[in-house]
């Protein structure tokens, strides 16, 4: 779960009290990746990727630890693509607050994203900094409010609502830059398709996806934010309470809302990208726990995902797909592996630099409703 405004500190593990709301959607494509016909490309719109590692670092299959980045030692897991002769598309999946990195990679209800390596994707899974390089750490260490100017603990994904967050208004933070460095290093050992670099995640991982795309749209080809936050603010960047953020989006559901998920102000232009936003339906909510053990609603993923879809859909070089289902605040539960492959195949059908006008959305798996553009009908 992600939180938006932290005026009062409570616990679930520990939790920041108020949130800017969220609403998102889910997207994918039924076409087989190898059979997909890429859209007309504009390679000039992309920047070349430099495959390089920190001095002396060597990548291996499986868990990689002690990766030096911005004064920290980070970890990531590599599942090389199978049955691919040329450069493979890349999938960088992220867990949220409660489940571990290995859950997200191997447990069915958490996405089991490692299976995508069997379908031709090189899967590179970053381990959260809060987990101290241990991919088995769950919410006992990572679920709760952030520190040092960050709103939420699992990922460095949104600036705090108090003055400490000011530092991150136009600084991407150590996770967004780590993901880029990680992929660049993996590319020294495995052939990677520089025009098909994708990332995505659930909850805080979805929020982190939004942040990475907003700060690094020159690197990523696209992303899959599932129930991610936008941390909606007022137009001048002033943080809003949970209730005020919900009300702001409800009052103007088609507006481009500023948010603490990205730089302030939001970029005038991003892309080229393909972004698929997933909203888990009416049950895509999160309850936090007060110190006395009582529960209260602290996250609603309708308004934040609406806000994210509005921004990306308004960008001329971005294809945005809005998808909805009924699984609530979880990794998509209906036909999970079919959804995962369909979503990644949809992303891969639109390599970086492709003409958005050439994009064709295919039928999603049963249980999902998707369309090109922002969410409609949520308000």
Curated annotation (Swiss-Prot):
Q: Which domain of life is it from?
A: Bacteria
The molecular function terms in GO held by this entry are: beta-diketone hydrolase activity
List the catalytic residues. Answer: 203, 309
Q: Entry's InterPro entries?
A: AB_hydrolase_fold (IPR029058), Plant_Biomass_Hydrol_Est (IPR050955)
Q: Which reaction does it catalyse?
A: nonane-4,6-dione + H2O = pentan-2-one + butanoate + H(+)
Q: Which residues constitute the signal peptide according to the record?
A: 1-23
The SS bond pairs are none
The UniProt keywords, alphabetically, are: Hydrolase, Signal
* Class of enzymatic activity (EC top level): hydrolase
Q: Which EC number applies?
A: 3.7.1.7
Briefly state the protein's biological role.
Catalyzes the hydrolysis of 4,6-nonanedione, a beta-diketone compound. Also mediates hydrolysis of oxidized polyvinyl alcohol (PVA) in the second step in the degradation of polyvinyl alcohol. Not active toward the monoketone structure.
Please report which protein family the annotation says this sequence is part of: Belongs to the peptidase S9A family.
**Quaternary arrangement and interactors, per the entry?**
Monomer.
Name of the protein: Oxidized polyvinyl alcohol hydrolase
**Which source organism does the UniProt entry give?**
Pseudomonas sp
Gene symbol here is pvaB
């Amino acid at each position: 779960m992600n939180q938006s405004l932290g005026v009062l500190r409570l616990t679930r593990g520990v939790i920041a009290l108020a949130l800017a709301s969220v609403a998102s959607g889910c997207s994918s494509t039924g076409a087989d990746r190898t059979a997909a016909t890429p859209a007309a490309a504009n390679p000039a719109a992309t920047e070349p990727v430099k495959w390089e590692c920190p001095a002396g670092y060597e990548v291996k299959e499986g868990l990689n630890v002690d990766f030096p980045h911005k004064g920290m030692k980070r970890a990531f897991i590599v599942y090389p693509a199978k049955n691919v002769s040329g450069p493979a598309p890349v999938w960088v999946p992220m867990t949220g607050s409660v489940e571990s990195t290995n859950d997200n990679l191997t447990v069915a209800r958490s996405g089991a994203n490692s299976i995508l390596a069997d379908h031709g994707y090189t899967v590179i899974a970053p381990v959260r900094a809060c987990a101290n390089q241990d991919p088995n750490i769950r919410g006992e260490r990572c679920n709760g409010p952030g520190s040092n100017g960050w709103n939420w603990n699992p990922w460095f994904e949104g600036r705090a609502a108090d003055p400490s967050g000011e530092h991150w208004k136009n600084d991407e933070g150590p996770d967004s830059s780590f993901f880029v460095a990680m992929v660049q290093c993996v590319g020294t050992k495995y052939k990677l398709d520089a025009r098909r670099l994708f990332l995505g995640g659930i909850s805080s991982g979805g929020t982190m996806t939004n942040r990475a795309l907003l700060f690094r749209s020159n690197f990523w080809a696209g992303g899959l934010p599932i129930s991610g936050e936008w941390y909606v603010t007022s137009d001048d960047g002033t943080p809003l309470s949970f209730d005020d953020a919900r009300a702001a989006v409800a009052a103007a559901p088609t507006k481009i809302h500023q948010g603490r998920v990205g730089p302030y102000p939001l970029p005038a232009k991003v892309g080229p990208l393909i972004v698929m936003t997933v909203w888990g339906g009416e049950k895509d909510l999160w309850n936090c726990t007060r110190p006395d053990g009582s529960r209260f609603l602290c996250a609603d993923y309708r308004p934040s995902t609406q806000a994210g879809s509005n921004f990306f859909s308004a960008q001329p070089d971005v294809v945005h797909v809005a998808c909805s289902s009924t699984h609530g605040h979880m990794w998509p539960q209906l036909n999970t592996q079919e959804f995962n492959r369909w979503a990644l195949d949809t992303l891969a059908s639109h390599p970086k630099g492709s003409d958005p006008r050439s994009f064709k959305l295919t039928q999603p798996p049963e249980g999902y409703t998707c369309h090109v553009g922002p969410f409609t009908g949520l308000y």
